[in-house]
A protein has these predicted regions:
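Outer membrane beta-barrel strand-and-loop segments of large Gram-negative receptors
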Residues: 403-405, 451, 535-537, 541, ...
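Surface-exposed extracellular loop regions of Gram-negative outer-membrane beta-barrel proteins
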Residues: 205-227, 327-329, 372-378, 419-432, ...
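Short, acidic Ser/Thr/Gly-rich low-complexity loop/linker segments typical of extracellular
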Residues: 48-62
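Membrane-proximal, glycine/serine-rich, low-complexity loop/turn segments characteristic
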Residues: 22, 34, 60-62, 83-85, ...
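Outer-membrane beta-barrel translocator domains and adjoining extracellular loop/strand segments
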Residues: 264-279, 323-340, 355, 381-390, ...
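A short, solvent-exposed loop/turn motif at the edges and junctions
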Residues: 45-50, 72-87
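Short, ordered, surface-exposed loop/turn motifs in non-cytosolic proteins
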Residues: 33-46, 70
């Protein structure tokens, strides 16, 4: 009853009444062992034997198709090696049929039917998992990793999906979700994955997008538990989920706890300060420290899915605490003439409730409306303490953070794959911070970004043109500073050419803008030590950027996929960290009097050598130039490799990355990343999953090197983290009751919003 009331309220919010017309026939085709039969052909006939339509099952034997009206229909099912099956079914949106085929006596021996796992569908790659992947993966991240999609890097432990040059936005059934959320989605409930390397439609604006399509279920429920424990240091991640489905409405509750406790990073740093009246050199060596973090979350999901609409209501609460992050060290100044003991301590606490509403309605067969509204409140506290023989500072910050996000879309689908859509959205932020202690101030910021776009897609045989003109309005204001408003047209245009079914070339051009982060756009400052101060800049201007991308994909047979990716970007008013002298102190702030250009070239190959052996290799080259108040040139290349081998109920995974360099603007520190490698052994049996794994097991002192060179300051820092080397065990179990129900996902944003300027 509560679910129906909430759904009714959201329908009233959307103010659109859906129309009903067609109904659905769906089911699963299995063999005598109840194992899904892939790619079986299904014919749908009326009771008078009039042909209605045909459909093919997917890689695990599931099919779904619409018919004009409810009632009885005849299904004829055929698959190579099995006798044909004729079955009468009742068409309605609630029931699902199970059709069992029996092997025939004249089946051809040594004939294997394979469906291509990666195919090009219009503007995206469609990836259908095969039996081996379903058998040897447990959650959404495992499945995405084993699919070996070209140009993607999947970190199963951190829960991150990235591509060279940017991050990938994740969606489940068209709804935007966070990276961590996909972990709760069971792999066996995923029908297919859509990868938009050049996002279009509702995904336009993303650097790259993944939409995970799941299998709908209407009855039953489940209770699921999973846990991961690190053995090299103290870290545990434990989660519990329960779901009940009734008809078109499902209720899901999640809860989880994460604890991290480890020795602080070992740091060796050399610094040179080039002040006008003084040259200072010093070195720093840490000798002990500790870092503790705790995190808890709970979330309630209510989901209603009908033929003509889908509604979602989500309420979540996240608590994050960093009770201590302390490092003790010795500072040697002016070539070890003097030494000073140092102690740096940071603590933080955050509590963030969040409400999200989403609706997708088919007004007609050719028109649809999509609306989303979310609101967040954050109560944050942060403290920064520094102590040596000469200086003792302590700054405490308390913050109230409010944000809201609205998005609306109306779309029309024309014949021949042409479409027209209208997009409208707004993002609002309001934060109030009280700084107390060594630095005292009251800060108030608010900002908004509103945008409107029109998108049109036109098909010309093997060519497709997409035009998306629009405009955005940026406004932000910090207390005691001038308000900044910025109105600018925006444009995204993409040309697709598909010379053959297995090849596609795309050219994408983008002109857009962005405004600075709230933590940079302020007047606050934090004391790092007796010579260094970190300060905000309330006068930062919006940044304009121009981007061009050429993408080429080719599929060779059903085993090899190759992707070539070339990207050029130019940014005006590039945000860059700046360093300057003030009263014999080094000030670290942010500056926008810079421009940058960058070029990225990537080549990716995935190879399905056999049903049991899979391989993926990526190579990337990156070149960046920055000029203006700060000038630098940056080049690097790096290679990545993944190998998977399946044997019975076991999966063996190994991966390796070459050493490389990273510089991610606005940070101008160059980080030298060492060789990294790892592996795991996974065992999946029915509802149980166990895994043991390791990262860099033979590199106890895996060292990261960070270098910074600006006119007033040079530094080189060697960092050895106790968390670089990992040994972990992982276990998961799911108890199903009633009919098997789709495993839901933890649709929860674990990031806490804050505009506090932090020392580190």
């Amino acid at each position: 009853m509560k679910g129906k009331i909430v759904s009714f309220i959201l329908l009233a919010f959307i103010s659109v009444t859906p129309a009903y017309g067609q109904t659905t026939i769906k089911g699963t085709i299995v063999d005598s062992l109840q194992v899904g039969i892939p790619y079986a052909a299904v014919k749908v006939l009326k009771m008078d034997s009039t042909f209605v339509k045909g459909v093919a099952a997917d890689s695990i034997g599931c099919f779904q198709t619409s018919v004009p009206q409810e009632g009885k229909y005849i299904l004829i099912v055929n698959s190579l090696g099995y006798d044909s099956k004729v079955q009468i079914v009742e068409a309605n949106n609630a029931s699902s049929s199970v059709i069992t085929l029996t092997p025939n006596s004249i089946a051809l021996h040594d004939v294997v039917v394979r469906g291509s796992s990666i195919t090009r569908k219009d503007t995206h790659l469609q990836i259908i998992p095969d039996k081996q992947i379903y058998k040897h993966t447990n959650n959404g991240y495992d499945l995405l990793y084993d699919l070996m999609i070209p140009n993607l890097q999947i970190d199963r432990q951190k829960g991150a999906v990235t591509t060279i040059g940017g991050t990938v936005t994740l969606y489940i059934d068209g709804r935007k979700v966070e990276y961590r959320e996909v972990k709760g989605l069971k792999s066996k409930d995923i029908l297919k994955v859509e990868y938009y390397d050049v996002p279009t439609g509702k995904y336009a604006g993303d650097y790259a997008s993944i939409n995970i399509i799941t299998r709908p279920m209407t009855t039953g429920g489940y209770i699921s538990v999973d846990g991961t424990q690190q053995l090299a240091y103290q870290e545990g991640d434990y989660n519990l989920a329960a779901k009940v489905a009734h008809g078109s409405t499902s209720f899901t509750i999640f809860g989880g706890y994460n604890r991290l406790h480890y020795d602080a990073d070992k740091i060796e740093r050399e610094e040179f300060f080039h002040f006008d009246n003084n040259e200072i050199s010093r070195s720093y060596s840490s000798y002990e420290g500790v870092n503790k973090q705790n995190q808890e979350y709970v979330q309630l999901n209510i989901l209603t899915k009908k033929k003509k609409y889908m509604l979602s209501e989500k309420l979540s609460l996240v608590r994050k605490e960093n009770p201590i992050n302390q490092t003790n060290g010795i500072l040697f100044a002016n070539t070890a003439q003097t030494s000073t003991a140092q102690c740096s301590t940071n603590t933080s606490y955050s509590l963030m409730p969040r409400l999200s509403l989403y609706g997708n309605i088919d007004v007609t067969d050719k028109q649809y409306v999509e609306l989303s509204l979310s609101g967040t409140y954050g109560r944050n506290k942060y403290s920064n303490m520094y102590k040596d023989e000469k200086l003792n500072t302590n700054t405490i910050v308390k913050e109230d953070y409010y944000s809201a996000n609205f998005y609306g879309k109306y779309g029309i689908i024309f014949p021949h794959k042409n479409s027209l859509s209208f997009h409208l959205g707004s993002v609002y932020m309001n934060t109030m911070s009280q700084y107390m202690g060594t630095y005292e101030a009251w800060q108030h910021q608010w900002s908004s970004q509103s945008y409107a776009f029109v998108e049109y897609v036109q098909q010309f045989n093997k060519w497709r043109l997409r035009l998306k003109p629009g405009a955005s309005a940026l406004y932000y204001h910090t207390k005691d500073a001038d308000a900044v408003s910025h109105y600018i047209p925006q444009l995204q245009s993409t040309i697709f050419w598909q010379p053959t079914k297995s090849q596609q070339v795309s050219l994408d051009i983008l002109f857009s803008n962005a405004y600075p982060t709230s933590s940079s756009l302020n007047t606050a400052e934090q004391i790092i030590d007796d010579l260094r101060i970190k300060r905000g800049n309330e006068n930062l201007r919006p940044m304009d950027f121009y981007q061009g991308t050429v993408n080429y994909n080719i599929q060779i047979g059903s085993k090899i996929n190759i992707t070539s990716f070339s990207n050029f970007v130019y940014q005006h008013h590039q945000y860059v960290q700046t360093y300057y002298e003030e009263n014999d102190k080094l000030i670290n702030s942010m500056d926008d009097h810079n421009n940058s250009r960058g070029f990225i070239e990537m080549l990716s190959l995935s190879w399905k050598a056999t049903d049991n052996l899979r391989l993926k290799i990526d190579g990337v080259y990156n070149h960046t130039d920055v000029w203006g108040k700060f000038r630098t040139t940056f080049n690097f290349w790096r290679a990545y490799m993944n190998v998977n081998y399946y044997c019975n109920e076991f999966a063996f995974r190994i991966w390796a990355n070459t050493k490389g360099k990273e510089m991610i603007l606005p940070m101008i520190t160059v980080e030298h990343v060492p060789v990294n490698y790892g592996g795991s052994i996974n065992w999946n049996h029915k509802d149980w999953s166990f895994e043991v794994g390791t990262v860099s097991p033979f590199h106890k002192n895996n060292e990261f090197i960070e270098t910074l060179n600006v006119p007033v300051y040079n530094s080189q820092e060697h960092i050895i983290s106790s968390t670089n080397r990992k040994f972990y065990i992982q276990a998961a179990y799911t108890f199903n009751f009633g009919k098997k129900t789709q495993k839901d996902w933890k649709n929860i944003d674990m990031n806490v919003n804050s505009a506090i300027l932090k020392a580190k």
